[in-house]
Structure formats: C-alpha cells, structure tokens
Curated annotation (Swiss-Prot):
Pfam families: RimK, Rimk_N. Mg(2+) 1 binds at residues 248, 260. This is Probable alpha-L-glutamate ligase. GO terms for cellular component: cytoplasm. Mn(2+) 2 binds at residues 260, 262. Binds 2 magnesium or manganese ions per subunit. Mg(2+) 2 binds at residues 260, 262. SUPFAM superfamilies: Glutathione synthetase ATP-binding domain-like. ATP binds at residues 141, 178-179, 187, 211-213. GO terms for molecular function: ATP binding; metal ion binding; ribosomal S6-glutamic acid ligase activity.
Length: 301
C-alpha cells in the first residue's frame, strides 16, 4: 500500500516508528506537512497539492495533527477523504475529540464516568460556579490547552476565584473540574486500536506536581487495568468515533472517570513502558480496514 502520514516533523519518535513499521511490512510511506498542502475544492475532481505536485494514489493516511493546527489539518484530511483515501481517524472524529467541551457533553450523554465539570466564559457568580462542582480544591483548565499547559490546581476557594478572574482577563473559555484527590497525581493512558485496549500505562506526576503528562515531567510504568477501566476506554473511543486513540482515565472513589480522549496519542511513552510494538499494530489495523471511501461519513465531513 501507499500510505501518507500527516506530520509536521518526520523526526518525531511517533512518526519515525510508524514509517519503520510500515516499511518493514512492505508499504511505501510519505510524510506530508499539512500546513504546506493547498487544495483544489472541486465537485468532480478534488485535489491536494504539495510542493508543486498533485498528491494522489494513496491508499491510506495517518493523521498526526497537532492541536495548534487542528482546523487546517482536519481540512486537509477531509480533502483526502473526499478523494477516497482511507483515514486512520476521520476528520470529523478528530475535530470532535479536540473540542474538550463537546467531548465531555457527548460522553456524559452516554453515561460515561466523568469528573464533575463546570463550563464558563465570564461567570457573574464565581461562588455559584465553584459550588456546582463541589467547591475547592478544583482543577481549572483553558478549553484550548494541551499537554498539561493551561491547567491549574486551585487548593482553596480564594485561589480558585483568583485563577478564574485571571483567565477571564484572557477572554477565554474555561472548564472547572472537581479534583480527584484519591488518584494521587496518577492517571491511566489506555491505548485503543480498533475497539480494543492494546496497551495501558500509569503516568505519575513528579513530586509537587499534579499533572501527570509526560511533557510535564511525569513518569510512565506498566499497569494492569480492571475490566471496568477497559470497558470505559473502549466506550469512550467508540463515542468519539476514533479508531486509534489514547484514553486518559483517573481512578476515583466512584469508578474510572475519563479526563480526555486523545486522537493523536504519542507512541514513545506507551511503547517504552509496555515494550509493545504499537506502531506495527496500527499499520496492521490499516491493512485490515483500508478500502476506498471506507469512512462513516463517506468523506462528507
């Protein structure tokens, strides 16, 4: 097969591993920077151009789209879908998962365990907002944050008020969530491929930190998850419509709660912690499922 990888950096671990795995299995691979693509929006012959040439003949495309380029990256991916190229994850599913509020609303509607969450822009009554999530301590997040950036733990009511007021000055949308103290600064990353959890790891925040993201200095280790945690991760992936994703869970006193569903999960941490060949499993999934126009939305977005 001829496989495209939408990635801005061919040297990143995840991109390199996907290239290696695909080539080892006899496929032709090309890395494409989504921001350098330009498109011909045509009803009878949609095209993607790149560095002066028309990109065609691809059987599948693997989107590795960073959060900062979600809008343009998904537009490029959607164009490939319209051309009949099989996407590992569909553009509409990526857009859905990148919208933190929409994700939480969809998951809550289907009864998936979540932390108690408030959503606000410029709340008139901060006290009432804090009371709706059970009061301090709370975690306050910028809606557009990623990799633990724009996430603050407010231990007291006054600290929470100060953080919310500061975020108000940014004219930003915020999420205010209950702090799951019993998680002790750890979360679970469940790596889902094709409706199955193929690997899982525990991420532990460094001392004095509550964010367990590896980008924030957290450490990763192998973990055995419970059947309930496994089922929760699979359901979350299905609700988001993602074939491949990382589902982040916290162990709370009332069962597993979903913190995030990541449509472009890093491979390095999970492969290192579990010693599993995740990249090859992703390529194997593509081999099994890649057919022209094989998307739920039929490339309609």
């Amino acid at each position: 097969m001829k496989i495209a990888i939408l990635s801005r950096n061919a040297k990143l671990y995840s991109t390199r591993r996907l290239i290696e795995a695909a080539e080892e299995r006899g496929h032709e691979v090309r890395v494409i920077d989504a921001l350098r693509c330009y498109m011909n929006i045509s009803s009878n012959h949609p095209q993607v151009h790149y560095k002066g040439e028309v990109l065609d003949g691809f059987d599948a495309i693997i989107p590795r789209i960073g959060a900062s380029i979600t809008f343009y990256g998904t537009a490029v991916l959607r164009q490939f879908e319209m051309m009949g190229v099989y996407p590992l994850n569909e553009s509409v599913a990526i857009s859905r998962s990148r919208d933190k509020l929409r994700s939480l609303q969809l998951l809550s509607r289907r009864g998936v365990g979540l932390p108690v969450t408030g959503f606000a822009h410029s709340p008139d009554d901060v006290n009432d907002l804090l009371e709706t999530v059970g009061g301090a301590p709370v975690v306050i997040k910028l809606l557009e944050g990623t990799q633990g950036v724009g996430v603050v733990l407010a231990d007291t009511h006054s600290a929470a008020e100060s953080v919310i007021q500061a975020f108000n000055g940014l004219k930003a949308n915020i999420l205010v969530q209950e702090f799951i103290k019993e998680a002790r600064g750890a979360d679970l990353r469940c790596f889902v491929i094709g409706g199955k959890v193929v690997a899982s790891m525990k991420r532990q925040a460094k001392d004095g930190e509550f964010r367990s993201n590896l980008h924030q200095g957290g450490s990763a280790s192998l973990v055995r998850i419970t059947p309930e945690e496994r089922a929760t991760a699979v359901r979350a992936a299905k609700i988001m419509g993602l074939n491949v994703c990382g589902v982040d869970l916290l162990r709370s006193n009332h069962g597993p709660v979903v913190m995030e569903v990541n449509s472009s999960p890093g491979i390095e941490g999970i492969e290192t912690a579990t010693q599993k060949d995740i990249a090859s499993q992703i390529i194997a999934f593509i081999e099994k499922n890649a057919k022209p126009h094989n998307t739920k939305t039929r490339g309609k977005g």
